């Protein structure tokens, strides 16, 4: 049985939620392998809208095992609230349908406070544009070996020692930012109170997944955000604090890289970005406004308006390489309906030199001017198309040109938020 990794191939918000939901019907296990509740998935199922941030998309599908892996940083209070929200929508969540890796680091209130204080203190041009939910500081504590992890909640002495170690680092930082010292006893009390609700789902995920794999179960690895926000290969420092590319799927749940059979990159038919950082094809004109309005480009987590621009084939070709993408799912093609002319970025002009990739140096990224190729648009509607025959000729040409430029085939084509409005070209789960 094939196992599939789903990764965003742009700056996030590519429509991963719908694609993961579409694929999860045939998966046995759906595993989140990185990120926190700073990323959101919106699923539309039989007219019901589910907005998920911490929970894997598979929870809304009965009979599946959903997993939160060790590569995730988890806000336990947010998770409990999100579980209650989806339960109120009729979704059943039990220890048989949801597991949390015992070695998953927790996001504490002190992480969010530090995150927000840093953003407020940052001068113009140095703000990252975080969601303020503590994801970055939580990953810092993980690397600094001072995290409170899920397993630590089971023993009071261990929990108190972990908190004390974290506060040795945080209290001096807080003083420097003008924040009062942490209420140690209050924080420990909060953690002890939430512990039973989290420990109910705690499990040795690495062991469970390896057993599932040996038994021939299909595993769907669900990434958050997008490869251009990867801590190593994204537009640093305007990135997230974890590895987002497909290689993280193995590390983030504790399964070997040989378990990955297919990497599906999710790609929007145009480009969007939330927060600060370079964006070569960004449009500040009527076309950009039109893309944002037609695509409903507002963040699931923050409600922030997304920056919009033309499709950047050079960037997507780059992310397909760093994630080893076998095929892409192209989403939101219907947003382009009615544009007379479409543009695709095929490379960059950097001080008179033509590049076919975005350079690493931040100053060079800011000076890269897009080199565009123009294509005729289409006036007909593509919304709800479920076969190639339903698409206008120019829409098919646009998709084919994208395939040529990014050097990767289209495996799936999405033409609306509804899960069934999908054209299947190549089955990622095919053995």
Curated annotation (Swiss-Prot):
Protein known as: Adenylosuccinate synthetase
Record bears the keyword Repressor: no
Pathway where this protein functions: Purine metabolism; AMP biosynthesis via de novo pathway; AMP from IMP: step 1/2
One GO cellular component term: cytoplasm
Residues given in the record as substrate binding sites: 300-306
Entry's cofactor comment: Binds 1 Mg(2+) ion per subunit.
Entry-linked SMART domains: Adenylsucc_synt
Organism: Dinoroseobacter shibae (strain DSM 16493 / NCIMB 14021 / DFL 12)
Lineage: Bacteria, Pseudomonadati, Pseudomonadota, Alphaproteobacteria, Rhodobacterales
């Amino acid at each position: 049985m094939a196992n599939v990794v789903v990764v965003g191939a742009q700056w996030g918000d590519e429509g991963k939620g719908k694609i993961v939901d579409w694929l999860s019907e045939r998966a046995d296990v759906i595993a989140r392998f990185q990120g926190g509740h700073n990323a959101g998935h919106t699923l539309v199922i039989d007219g019901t809208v589910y907005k998920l941030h911490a929970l894997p998309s598979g929870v809304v599908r009965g009979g599946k095992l959903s997993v939160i892996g060790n590569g995730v940083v988890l806000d336990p209070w947010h998770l409990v609230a999100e579980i209650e929200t989806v339960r109120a929508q009729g979704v059943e969540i039990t220890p048989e349908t949801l597991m949390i890796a015992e070695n998953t680091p927790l996001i504490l209130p002190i992480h969010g406070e530090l995150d927000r204080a840093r953003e407020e203190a940052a001068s113009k041009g140095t703000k990252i544009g975080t969601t303020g939910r503590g994801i970055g500081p939580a990953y810092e504590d993980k690397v600094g070996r001072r995290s409170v992890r899920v397993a630590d909640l089971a023993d009071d002495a261990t929990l108190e020692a972990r908190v004390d170690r974290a506060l040795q680092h945080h209290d001096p930082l807080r003083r420097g930012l003008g924040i009062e010292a942490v209420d140690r006893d209050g924080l420990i009390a909060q953690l002890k109170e939430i512990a039973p609700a989290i420990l109910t789902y705690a499990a040795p995920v690495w062991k469970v997944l390896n057993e599932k794999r040996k038994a021939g179960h299909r595993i769907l690895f669900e990434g958050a955000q997008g490869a251009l926000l990867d801590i190593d290969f994204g537009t640093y420092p305007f990135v997230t604090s974890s590895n987002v590319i497909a290689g993280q799927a193995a590390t983030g749940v504790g399964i070997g890289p040989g378990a990955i059979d297919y990497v599906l990159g999710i790609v929007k038919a145009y480009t969007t970005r939330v927060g600060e950082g370079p964006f070569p094809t960004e449009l500040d004109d009527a076309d950009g406004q039109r893309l944002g309005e037609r695509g409903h480009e507002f963040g699931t987590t923050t409600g922030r308006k997304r920056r919009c621009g033309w499709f950047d084939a050079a960037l997507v070709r780059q992310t397909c390489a760093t994630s080893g993408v076998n095929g892409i799912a192209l989403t939101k093609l219907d947003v382009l309906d009615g544009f007379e002319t479409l543009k695709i970025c095929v490379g960059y002009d950097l001080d008179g030199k033509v590049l076919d990739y975005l350079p690493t140096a931040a100053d060079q990224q800011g000076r890269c001017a897009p080199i565009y190729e123009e294509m005729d648009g289409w006036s007909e509607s593509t919304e709800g198309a479920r076969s190639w025959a339903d698409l206008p000729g120019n829409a098919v040409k646009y998709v084919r040109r994208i395939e040529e430029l990014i050097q990767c085939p289209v495996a799936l084509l999405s033409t609306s938020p509804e899960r069934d409005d999908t054209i299947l070209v190549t089955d990622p789960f095919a053995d």
